Swiss-Prot record:
This is Ribosomal RNA large subunit methyltransferase H. The lineage of its organism: Bacteria, Thermotogati, Thermotogota, Thermotogae, Thermotogales. Pfam families: SPOUT_MTase. The gene is rlmH. Belongs to the RNA methyltransferase RlmH family. InterPro entries: Alpha/beta_knot_MTases (IPR029028), RlmH-like (IPR003742), tRNA_m1G_MTases_N (IPR029026). PANTHER family: METHYLTRANSFERASE (PTHR33603), RIBOSOMAL RNA LARGE SUBUNIT METHYLTRANSFERASE H (PTHR33603:SF1). Specifically methylates the pseudouridine at position 1915 (m3Psi1915) in 23S rRNA. The keyword S-adenosyl-L-methionine applies.
Amino acid sequence: MRIRIVVGGKLDNFIKMGVDHYKKFLRRFCKTEIIELKRTHGGSVEEIVKRETEELKKRVLPGSLMVVMDRRGENLSSEEFAGFLKEVEMKGKDITFLIGGPYGLSEEILSEAHRVFSLSRMTFTHGMSVLIVLEQVFRAFKIIRGENYHY
């Protein structure tokens, strides 16, 4: 299984350290890839969101499930997320998680996504969101395999 996370913006160095930490742990479960997009500048907020959304969509793995991370999405427990991941893994599919930049994502991409999940009702930076998604993917695989980590 391949998991790609496409994020609208560059990651800070302290986030990259955490990303490397979880990518190392995830090696035995799946292949992970993080794609950082350059921030879009110029124009109205709506124009920026539209351009960033188009760039995110271009990076979706062919044939993968497109999962958008957005505060308007469905809130899942770690166990429910593990169930989702297990189902996708059993179907032999890959997943591309899309995380928008500071202005978020367009309504269009929310309607095109296979699933829309929320990490929390709180707002996180795009970098923190990447780190949280990676940790939850790792936690999900540990739950699926019945290994100690999640209590």
